[in-house]
């Protein structure tokens, strides 16, 4: 979603951050109900309510990505539709909405947003019904801005609406994919139960939302009204609008001295396949030590383009798009893929990977509608050493970026990843000295950002100043083993199920955590989800010992856990291994907890942790739920807490220390009030 790109990425990033800072200043006077009016002409519509992750931006200042767009939640806008939610229960439309609320329109109804700053582009996050066969439906959405001529967006559900058990199905009428798995709906294993339980269909509908971008054809001033209308006669019985992002996109970037891909046969109309032309452009650019330039347009690419020792620039992610179909292979590939599709890939790590690849200023639009884990249908993949990725928009692929090591020194910046079937980004197996920063990830079908040390450890990697919103499965940020990694200044909001905001897990065959792990100055919002399989609440941050113990130097410092559905912090081991593993030596310091449905800390494992300067308020149940390893001996819990002082709010009372058993996994949940300034 970024529009200005130079040969030197650093000046481009500086300009984007300057624009973001100016945008923040421009809207700061009008972001909250009751706030002072913006200077200038009187707005044509009601005062805009600008949010970040559905909150007053002041509550998350300094956390997350500094983006060029401004977020407005539909539930704060003017509408003659119906506000739905709040609801944090899985498999509901409100639970997957940003802020857990949205607006439902029937044909003829509208929702209006007042622009808080000048804009020439919008992004609409929406949901419409699926078709009866699960193949997807389309519906119009009329868009008008001020008195100008209206436009119509064609919404689709083709990339939304999954059903059933992992890895899910597009068929709403399908029977259980795994009848031999235990399910919470009947608290049974259906295949082993007599009489067989009744399974309602569609079973477990989820992944309801999609987003669509629109250039408005001109710049509209602050105060003009954007009206989104489900037109009379729409085939969609309802249209749910979650939010609108508005943005002032810079003019297209031009690179007159680069290798122009169009001159080598790439088709910006999208009618002809441009993959071979891109190969020619990459080859020429490497021979002549020049950059490949993709002018404005949509380029059809239906396979991977291999990149190595090359720079590829687009005109900006709003102007240059690589778009492809998912293509069924005649025979499975050696890696198990049965499909291919649009993607830029480094060489396989087995042959050393690629190096010195620099990608910036374009979008990749895939066509992935189902999850097949063996398929390599990701937007960016392979191994990229000493490389950079900046200012991309990645949409409708399986994973935005999946990197297989060994590889080192990759920098991902200022990138948007949205509407993925699985992860947003995964550093997998031996990725070192790499980072993603100032990037925005929304509506992933698995972990938003992950470091997975499967077989070979990751080391010295950083996730910094990213925003992860509404992962519909798993976690916002997940860390599976590794050495000396850092997660800092991120904003994670609205995880839904089978995960939470931040996970530290010894699972999935990951190598051990060694050295240090720093989790510092992050904010989570509306996390601490309900774990359906365990029938308990998780923590906004949760530590999970399954494959092995967790005993590295782990420092959780300066974080804020806001509006937690259940717990703020959880340390847990799985029941079958509870007497073989432990979580020890985790240090929590300088943390604020504003609202828990249940506890500040829930310990369901052997081990220990220390706490210093943890301020907590609006705690729904006992401050510490300490079950340990569930042996309940007179010596107390197998988990010990150390009070290092400065813990305010009464949550860590002396009688709880060091290991008093207070085990109640399912206390009454007290919904906390909305977060407020401390």
Give the location of each predicted region.
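Short glycine/acidic-rich loop motifs that flank beta-strands on beta-rich extracellular proteins
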Residues: 290, 301-304, 317, 321-327, ...
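Extracytoplasmic
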Residues: 45-256
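Extracellular beta-strand-rich solenoid/capping regions of secreted or surface-exposed proteins
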Residues: 279, 283-284, 299-313, 321-360, ...
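Secretory targeting and sorting signals
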Residues: 1-44
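Right-handed parallel beta-helix
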Residues: 318, 355-366, 385-398, 407-422, ...
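Extracellular beta-strand solenoid repeats
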Residues: 283, 293, 300, 306, ...
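Acidic Gly/Asp/Thr-rich repetitive segments characteristic of extracellular carbohydrate-active
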Residues: 261-293
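Leucine-rich solenoid repeat scaffolds
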Residues: 603-666
């Amino acid at each position: 979603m970024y529009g200005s790109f130079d040969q030197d990425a650093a000046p481009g990033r500086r300009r984007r951050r300057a624009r973001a800072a100016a945008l923040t200043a421009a809207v700061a006077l009008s972001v909250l109900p009751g706030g002072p009016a913006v200077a200038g002409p009187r707005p044509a519509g009601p005062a805009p309510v600008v949010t970040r992750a559905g909150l007053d931006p002041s509550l998350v200042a300094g956390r997350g990505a500094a983006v060029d767009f401004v977020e407005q939640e539909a539930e704060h806008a003017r509408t003659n539709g119906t506000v739905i939610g709040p609801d944090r229960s899985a498999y509901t439309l409100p639970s997957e909405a940003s802020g857990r609320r949205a607006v439902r329109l029937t044909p003829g109804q509208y929702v209006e947003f007042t622009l808080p700053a000048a804009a020439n582009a919008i992004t609409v996050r929406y949901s419409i019904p699926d078709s009866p066969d699960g193949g997807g439906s389309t519906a119009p959405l009329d868009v008008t801005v001020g008195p100008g001529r209206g436009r119509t967006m064609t919404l689709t559900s083709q990339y939304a609406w999954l059903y059933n058990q992992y890895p899910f199905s597009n068929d709403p009428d399908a029977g259980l994919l795994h009848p031999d798995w235990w399910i919470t709906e009947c608290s049974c294993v259906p295949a082993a139960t007599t009489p067989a339980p009744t399974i309602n269909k569609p079973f477990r509908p989820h992944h309801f939302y999609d987003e669509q971008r629109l250039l408005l054809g001109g710049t509209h001033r602050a105060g003009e009204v954007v009206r989104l209308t489900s037109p009379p006669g729409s085939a969609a019985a309802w249209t749910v609008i979650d939010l609108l992002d508005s943005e002032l996109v810079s003019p297209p970037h031009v690179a007159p001295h680069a290798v122009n891909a169009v001159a080598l046969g790439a088709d910006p109309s999208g009618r002809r396949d441009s993959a071979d032309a891109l190969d020619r452009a990459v080859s020429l650019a490497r021979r002549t030590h020049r950059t490949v330039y993709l002018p404005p347009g949509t380029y059809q690419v239906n396979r991977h383009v291999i990149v190595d020792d090359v720079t590829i620039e687009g005109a900006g992610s709003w102007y240059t798009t690589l778009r492809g179909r998912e293509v069924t292979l005649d025979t499975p590939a050696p890696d198990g893929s049965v499909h291919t599709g649009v993607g830029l890939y480094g060489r396989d790590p087995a042959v050393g990977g690629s190096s010195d690849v620099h990608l910036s200023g374009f979008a990749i639009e895939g066509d992935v509608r189902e999850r097949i884990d063996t398929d390599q249908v990701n937007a960016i993949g392979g191994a990229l050493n000493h490389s950079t990725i900046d200012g991309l928009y990645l949409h409708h692929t399986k994973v935005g970026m999946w990197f297989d090591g060994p590889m080192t020194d990759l920098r991902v910046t200022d990138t948007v990843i949205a509407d993925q079937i699985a992860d947003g980004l995964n550093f997998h197996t031996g990725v070192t000295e790499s980072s993603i920063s100032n990037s925005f990830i929304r509506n992933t079908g698995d972990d938003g950002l992950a470091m997975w040390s499967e077989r070979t450890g990751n080391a010295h990697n950083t996730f910094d100043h990213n925003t992860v919103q509404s992962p519909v499965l798993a976690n916002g940020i997940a860390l599976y083993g590794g050495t000396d990694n850092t997660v800092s200044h991120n904003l994670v909001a609205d995880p839904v199920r089978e995960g939470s905001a931040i996970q530290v897990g010894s699972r999935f065959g990951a190598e051990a955590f060694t050295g240090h792990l720093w989790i510092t100055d992050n904010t989570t919002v509306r996390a601490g989800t309900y774990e359906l399989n365990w029938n308990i609440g998780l923590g906004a941050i949760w530590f999970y010992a399954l494959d092995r113990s967790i005993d590295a130097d782990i420092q959780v410092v300066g974080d804020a856990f806001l509006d937690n559905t259940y717990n703020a912090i959880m340390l847990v081991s799985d029941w079958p291994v509870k007497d073989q593993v432990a979580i020890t030596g985790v240090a929590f310091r300088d943390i604020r907890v504003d609202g828990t449905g249940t506890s500040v800390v829930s310990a369901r494992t052997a081990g220990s942790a220390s706490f210093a300067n943890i301020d907590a308020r609006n705690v729904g149940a006992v401050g510490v739920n300490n079950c340990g390893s569930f042996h309940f001996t007179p010596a107390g819990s197998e988990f010990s807490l150390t009070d290092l002082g400065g813990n305010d709010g009464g949550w860590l009372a002396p009688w709880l220390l060091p290991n008093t058993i207070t085990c109640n996994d399912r206390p009454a949940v007290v919904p906390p009030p909305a977060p407020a300034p401390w």
